[in-house]
Amino acid sequence: MLKEFQEFALKGNMVDLAIGVIIGGAFGGLVNSIVNDIIMPIIGLITGGIDFSNMFIQLAGDPKTTLAAAREAGATIAYGNFITLLINFMIIAWVLFLVVKLMNRLKKREEAKPAPAAPSEEVLLTEIRDILAKQQKA
């Protein structure tokens, strides 16, 4: 049973998947930082200083000025967080689209290289005839 598990865990696809998950996690953190630390402040500046992380609709309780306070007081719809996560998702989806497109292009290049055609029977017989003719002349 241990041997079966070892074969399963060390298969090429399993290791590739593990590496992909680790890199994906790191990439997700990088995209989060890009969105929260670079893109959203620029969008906030363009839109007149709007802080998307603090945009919400309070459904219950006394009106609050921060999302954290509003969540403590009752139900909220944090649409600012949704906008941030949507931008985050779009960046990740775009990068994955580009990676898949690149992989498909590389696969097509590999498939496009035709294997050398095997010589036909006629070509082989012609070559044999020519060799025999040379041997008879010599």
Swiss-Prot record:
Pfam families per record: MscL (PF01741)
Keywords: Cell inner membrane, Cell membrane, Ion channel, Ion transport, Membrane, Transmembrane, Transmembrane helix, Transport
InterPro entries: Mechanosensitive_channel_CS, MS_channel, MSC/AndL, MscL_channel
Main localization of the protein described in the UniProt heading: membrane
GO cellular component: plasma membrane
Family per similarity comment: Belongs to the MscL family.
Transmembrane segments annotated in the record for this chain: 15-35, 38-58, 80-100
Protein topology in the membrane: Multi-pass membrane protein
GO molecular function, a single term: mechanosensitive monoatomic ion channel activity
Subunit structure: Homopentamer.
Disulphide-bridged cysteine pairs: none
Role description: Channel that opens in response to stretch forces in the membrane lipid bilayer. May participate in the regulation of osmotic pressure changes within the cell.
Gene designation: mscL
Protein name: Large-conductance mechanosensitive channel
Originating organism: Brucella ovis (strain ATCC 25840 / 63/290 / NCTC 10512)
PANTHER family in alphabetical order: LARGE-CONDUCTANCE MECHANOSENSITIVE CHANNEL, MECHANOSENSITIVE CHANNEL MSCL
Subcellular location: Cell inner membrane
PROSITE patterns to which the protein is assigned, alphabetical: MSCL
